[in-house]
Structures are given as C-alpha cells and as structure tokens.
C-alpha cells in the first residue's frame, strides 16, 4: 500500500510494517536498499516514511511498501493508521540491548490486534557487534508464536534479503519462489565475523530442538 502521493505499480505490491523499539536499526535496515531510499515518501499525519523496495523473483517483480515509523515509537504507541491494511510485518530487536527483546511480545500484540493472520518475521539486528546481550539460544518468542526468525546485521548487509524472501514466499503461496537478482544495496559500513556468526546460527539450530522455557525471563538466567 503506497501513500496517496506515491507512485503505484502494475506488479504485485504489499504493505510491510516494520516495528520494534527505537534505536534497534529499523531505518538503517530499510535504507540499505538504495532505490527504495531514493523513492521514499514521508506522511506527516501518521508520522511515517514509506520506502518502495523492489525485488526480482523467478515469478516476476514484486514490491514491498516498507512503512517505517520515523521514530514515532519513542513517543508512545503507534497509531492504528500505521498498521491498517498491513499485509506482512517485521518485528526488530537489538541483540546488544536485552530490553528491546523483552518488548517484542508487546509489539507483536499491538500488531496482531490490527493485522490478523499476516506473515511476520522476527529479526535480531546488530549481530556484528561484539558485546551481544541476547544469545541465540535465548531467542524463543518466534517459536511460541510460529514466526520466522533471522539474525541480521543491517550495517554489514548480512542476511538482508532473507526476511523479504520469506515474506514473498508466504504472500505468493510459493515455497520455491526465489530472487534472481540482488537489489542495489549500500556498501557495508562494518564487517561481520562470519565464523563467529556461524556459531550463533548453529546455537540457534540446537536451541530449536530444546523444550521451550515457561517464561522468556527464564532464558536469561
């Protein structure tokens, strides 16, 4: 869903809402996609910036109109107008700030109150930073709510496309859909230790086979 003053397209397009605490890297993440950054539009009445992000798939071009809060979440809850007609969502937290993960259930509740039964991806951002506070095995919320989870690093472009590919497959109802061309991304601002991150990803896989804790707080003990 584009803004009233924004160009529409004749290929499939979807409203993607991105939520999470302030400072988790939502805007940085969206701005990696250079053509979307060039064509963004701001809507002051809702306090939102909408970035049109195009991806090229084996089934043709698709567009996500990424609704970014432009920092409004720092002043309390978001208005329902931000969520209405949302067709998919990303909930983002910062793996270096434990509170941002503890607030994920609140964001999920607010989102699902307005947007029922939409595909949602949970993203743990800033995995390039050394002093990680939320370990991979401590991330369990997605398993409780049947969400997809990815570890990402917006500033290094690590796993940038994965949330979009997952959502595209869900929205198209085609598990074989794939991207045939990479979007133009801003050059990495930082470099990620891929060997260390591979260990986190392995920890995540092992945790998926463990029983869920009764309470998320238990995971941090």
Curated annotation (Swiss-Prot):
Residues in Small GTPase Ran-type domain copies: 10-174
InterPro entries noted in UniProt = P-loop_NTPase, Ran_GTPase, Small_GTP-bd, Small_GTPase
Q: What Gene Ontology molecular function terms does this protein carry?
A: GTP binding; GTPase activity
Q: Which GO terms describe its cellular component?
A: cytoplasm; nucleus
Please name the GO terms of the biological process aspect recorded for this protein, alphabetically: protein import into nucleus; ribosomal subunit export from nucleus
Q: Which UniProt keywords apply?
A: GTP-binding, Nucleotide-binding, Nucleus, Protein transport, Transport
Q: What is its main location?
A: nucleus
UniProt-listed Pfam families: Ras (PF00071)
Keyword Protein transport, does the record have it? Answer: yes
Start and end residues of each stretch annotated as Switch-II: 71-87
Give me the ranges of the annotated region Switch-I: 40-48
Q: What SUPFAM superfamilies does the entry give?
A: P-loop containing nucleoside triphosphate hydrolases (SSF52540)
Query: Subcellular location, in the record's words?
Result: Nucleus
Outline the subunit composition. Answer: Found in a nuclear export complex with RanGTP, exportin and pre-miRNA.
Entry's family note: Belongs to the small GTPase superfamily. Ran family.
Annotated PANTHER family: GTP-BINDING NUCLEAR PROTEIN RAN1 (PTHR24071:SF41), RAN GTPASE (PTHR24071)
Task: Outline what the protein does.
Answer: GTP-binding protein involved in nucleocytoplasmic transport. Required for the import of protein into the nucleus and also for RNA export. Involved in chromatin condensation and control of cell cycle.
Record protein name field:
GTP-binding nuclear protein Ran1
């Amino acid at each position: 869903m584009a803004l009233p003053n924004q160009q529409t397209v004749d290929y499939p397009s979807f409203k993607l809402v991105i939520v999470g605490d302030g400072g988790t890297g939502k805007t940085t993440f969206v701005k990696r996609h250079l053509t979307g950054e060039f064509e963004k539009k701001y809507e002051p009445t809702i306090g939102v910036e909408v970035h049109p992000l195009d991806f090229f798939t084996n089934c043709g071009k698709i567009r996500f109109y990424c609704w970014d809060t432009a920092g409004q979440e720092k002043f309390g809850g978001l208005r329902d107008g931000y969520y209405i007609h949302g067709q998919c969502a990303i909930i983002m937290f910062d793996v270096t700030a434990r509170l941002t993960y503890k607030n994920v259930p609140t964001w999920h509740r607010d989102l699902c109150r307005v947007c029922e039964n939409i595909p949602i991806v949970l993203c743990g951002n800033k995995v390039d930073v050394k002093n990680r506070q939320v370990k991979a095995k401590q991330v369990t919320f997605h398993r409780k709510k049947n969400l997809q989870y990815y570890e990402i690093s917006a500033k290094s472009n690590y796993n940038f496309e994965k949330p979009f590919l997952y959502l595209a497959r869900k929205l198209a109802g085609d598990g074989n859909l794939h991207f045939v061309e990479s979007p133009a991304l801003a050059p990495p601002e930082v470099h990620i230790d891929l060997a260390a991150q591979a260990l986190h990803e392995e920890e995540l896989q092992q945790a998926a086979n463990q029983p869920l804790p009764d309470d998320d707080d238990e995971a941090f003990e």
